[in-house]
Curated annotation (Swiss-Prot):
Zn(2+) binds at C6, C9, H27, C29. It comes from Sulfurisphaera tokodaii (strain DSM 16993 / JCM 10545 / NBRC 100140 / 7) (Sulfolobus tokodaii). Pathway: Amino-acid biosynthesis; L-lysine biosynthesis via AAA pathway; Amino-acid biosynthesis; L-arginine biosynthesis. GO terms for biological process: L-arginine biosynthetic process; lysine biosynthetic process via aminoadipic acid. It comes from the Archaea. This is Alpha-aminoadipate/glutamate carrier protein LysW. The modification 5-glutamyl glutamate is found at E56. A zinc finger (TFIIB-type) spans 1-34. Binds zinc ions via its zinc finger domain, as shown by X-ray crystallography. In contrast, the absorption spectrum of the ortholog from Thermophilus suggests that it may bind iron ions, possibly via the predicted zinc finger domain. InterPro entries: LysW. The lineage of its organism: Archaea, Thermoproteota, Thermoprotei, Sulfolobales, Sulfolobaceae. Carrier protein that bears the covalently bound substrates for arginine and lysine biosynthesis; bound L-glutamate is sequentially converted to L-ornithine, while bound alpha-aminoadipate (AAA) is sequentially converted to L-lysine.
Length: 56
């Protein structure tokens, strides 16, 4: 496990060693976080909230 910091509450987030950029993890604070590659190392950012597309 890799321990990263939550960008919302600054708490520790345990991320699996085999996590890939683009994966979503949920933290205790309720934030949905996206794993991304920050210059060769894993980091977390707030996941973009995508609404439903009704084709309108």
């Amino acid at each position: 496990m890799v321990v990263l910091k939550c960008p919302v509450c600054n708490g520790d987030v345990n991320v699996p060693d085999d996590a890939l950029p683009g994966e979503i993890v949920e933290h205790e604070c309720g934030a949905q976080l996206e794993v991304y590659n920050d210059h060769g190392r894993l980091a977390l950012r707030l996941a973009e909230q995508v609404g439903e597309d009704w084709g309108e």
